[in-house]
Each structure stands twice: as structure tokens, then as C-alpha cells.
């Protein structure tokens, strides 16, 4: 048949991360869940303080303050103010970018694989 079908990309959840720690590191399930929860809580708290988070080989999370700016209602064309806000940005490391690029597109599955 030859046509590649696009499979739904998987989503890795916090619960699955904890399960992987349980399986690969040998922690018990409660410890694995606590580590995952604590890891993300520390990142969340650092960003809430306005700190950057740098994860070597993965990427950087930063908080940016966006100034107020004029916006436009697309339906009416009316100018509306957009308030100042803080946003989180993520910049992938070169190592992560290379890993993703070299992995190809795992969401593409051949007809033969899809039939299994």
C-alpha cells in the first residue's frame, strides 16, 4: 500500500514519569511519585519568583514580562487594550533539538504497522 498513516502522538504524563522511575530506578511507587511532584513544584516555585530554570541538555525556562499593548477585536476592528502580563517561555537546548531532529517522526506509521 505504501501510504504512511499518521498515528496520534503519545502524551507522557506525570503519572507515567513516576511509573518509569519506579521501573528503571527501582524506587517504590510512592517515592517515584513524590520525586516527580517535587521536581515540578520546584520548577513552578522558581518561575513564580521570576527565576530562570536551566536544565542542562534539556533547555531553559524563563519568565518574561510583556508590556501592555493595543490589540484589535478581529470581528469588529475595535482597538482594545491588552494588559501587561508575565509569561513563561521555554528554549530547548541544542542537544534536545538534535535528539528530536534525529529521531525522525515517530508518529508516522506504515500501513503494515498500523494493521498489527
Curated annotation (Swiss-Prot):
- In this chain, the stretch annotated as Disordered covers 58-80, 94-116
Question: Which residues lie in Polar residues bias regions?
Answer: 94-105
- List GO terms (cellular component aspect): cytosol
Q: Which Pfam families match?
A: Bac_DNA_binding
A Gene Ontology biological process annotation?
positive regulation of metabolic process
Q: Which UniProt keywords apply?
A: DNA recombination, DNA-binding, Transcription, Transcription regulation, Translation regulation
State whether keyword RNA-binding applies. Answer: no
So which domain of life are we looking at?
Answer: Bacteria
Q: Which InterPro entries match?
A: Hist_DNA-bd (IPR000119), Histone-like_DNA-bd_CS (IPR020816), IHF-like_DNA-bd_dom_sf (IPR010992), IHF_alpha (IPR005684)
Q: Does Transcription regulation appear among the keywords?
A: yes
Q: Name one GO molecular function term.
A: structural constituent of chromatin
Q: What does this protein do?
A: This protein is one of the two subunits of integration host factor, a specific DNA-binding protein that functions in genetic recombination as well as in transcriptional and translational control.
Q: Which family does it belong to?
A: Belongs to the bacterial histone-like protein family.
Q: Partners and quaternary state?
A: Heterodimer of an alpha and a beta chain.
What is this protein identified as? Integration host factor subunit alpha
Classification of source organism: Bacteria, Pseudomonadati, Pseudomonadota, Betaproteobacteria, Burkholderiales
Amino acid at each position: 500500500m505504501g501510504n504512511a498513516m499518521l498515528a496520534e502522538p503519545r502524551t507522557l504524563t506525570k503519572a507515567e514519569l513516576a511509573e518509569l522511575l519506579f521501573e528503571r530506578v527501582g524506587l517504590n511507587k510512592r517515592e517515584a511519585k513524590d520525586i516527580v511532584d517535587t521536581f515540578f513544584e520546584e520548577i513552578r516555585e522558581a518561575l513564580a519568583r521570576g527565576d530562570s530554570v536551566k536544565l542542562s541538555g534539556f533547555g531553559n525556562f524563563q519568565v518574561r514580562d510583556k508590556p501592555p499593548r493595543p490589540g484589535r477585536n478581529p470581528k469588529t476592528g475595535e482597538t482594545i487594550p491588552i494588559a501587561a502580563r508575565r509569561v513563561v517561555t521555554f528554549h530547548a537546548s541544542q542537544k534536545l533539538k538534535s535528539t528530536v531532529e534525529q529521531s525522525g517522526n515517530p508518529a508516522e506509521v506504515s500501513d503494515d504497522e498500523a494493521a498489527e
